[in-house]
Amino acid sequence: MLENIRDAVRKFLTGSTPYEKAVDEFVKELQKSLISSDVNVKLVFSLTAKIKERLNKEKPPSVLERKEWFISIVYDELSKLFGGDKEPNVNPTKLPFIIMLVGVQGSGKTTTSGKLAYFYKRRGYKVGLVAADVYRPAAYDQLLQLGNQIGVPVYGEPNNQNAIEIAKKGVDTFVKNKMDIIIVDTAGRHGYGEETKLLEEMKEIYEALKPDDVILVIDASIGQKAYDLASRFHQASPIGSIIITKMDGTAKGGGALSAVAATGATIKFIGTGEKIDELEIFNAKRYVSRILGMGDIESILEKVKGLEEYEKIQKKMEDVMEGKGKLTLRDVYAQIMALRKMGPLSKVLQHIPGLGVMLPTPSEDQLKLGEEKIRRWLAALNSMTYKELENPSIIDKSRMRRIAEGSGLEVEDVRELLEWYNNMNKLLKMVKRRRGSIDKLFGGKIG
């Protein structure tokens, strides 16, 4: 799946096929690749319908070529398919923090317990593992081996068949030993199709332990079948989250991810390999970047991000012109950085309406700030303190000398930046006064 879509992106961006035909071919390849990854057919066609709808309704930003804009829409909609902007919180909300892992037989739950313990140990937490899977004979030995490998203590009672009793004793022991995070590996005796029994058992252990987090472990190879299990789990345990394992060993990973995301459940981690450190926090946008080929779309995403940041600053400029708030050198810095992300300044400035108002300068054409001047100004801004950026009026000759020395510039460079900043504020006040005069002339505000 990943390779096919990545190749399609590269072909689309570099090929000479006419735009409309290239879009149709790409959409067909996207549908084919997603369906072969076991993504639900309805979800696939809903996705491509949304892409086409946006293509027809929206106008491409001036800083993006049409093909770049199309790929940015594909990226956005695919990200929504796999969970959108939801960023899972992996930090414990209290200490000790008790995590209970559940999952059907063969899901990779015990291995994931070890990976999770290693993840938190690397972050500086004291971690303990509780082996409460009493139905699989090798579960305790496997967890003990993992614990020894990563230097994490394991509590277990190989001759005790009471999972709840073991779990409670293990948690109590680690609480007394002042462990920060306690991970309980519960039984995985039920197979897929026996979700009801699994969830009933989960509730029993939950009531006994009152854990702070319940995590369901799902094998990616079940593809879209993950929907039923994730849906029931999400309804039974709203505080719970999900780990999808074995993403590296199946073509159905996309199907499992999209199915779980469709339930509204939070995907916290994905397992990306067999090694103990191959567990990563799930981020839908990062995952989609990988699918589309990070090298091919990185510059597009950078331009889109720059445009979004620029529009935020532009909104603030408009507020200042309306007399709301003030513009600081911190805003100027953010504006320049946003423009740099959108491409070469000489090209970007030509495509931004009203930039003469946004970036006025007394000595050059308002639409063409030189790269060298921008470089010097950024160096000066980087050498200023927080107070100086927020309140430039405090910058006297002594501060100018310090800023110049810290940035490798002349004092005149710093003075020029401050003059430009002051002229910009004067211009904004003029615009505000002119707007006020027009409002009075017409008896009120005009849109």
Curated annotation (Swiss-Prot):
Transmembrane segments: none
Catalyzed reactions per annotation: GTP + H2O = GDP + phosphate + H(+)
Known EC number: 3.6.5.4
Organism: Saccharolobus islandicus (strain M.14.25 / Kamchatka #1)
Underlying gene: srp54
Compartment(s): Cytoplasm
Record GO terms (molecular function): 7S RNA binding; ATP hydrolysis activity; GTP binding; GTPase activity
Annotated protein name in UniProt: Signal recognition particle 54 kDa protein
Alphabetical list of Gene3D superfamilies matching this protein: P-loop containing nucleotide triphosphate hydrolases, Signal recognition particle SRP54, nucleotide-binding domain, Signal recognition particle, SRP54 subunit, M-domain
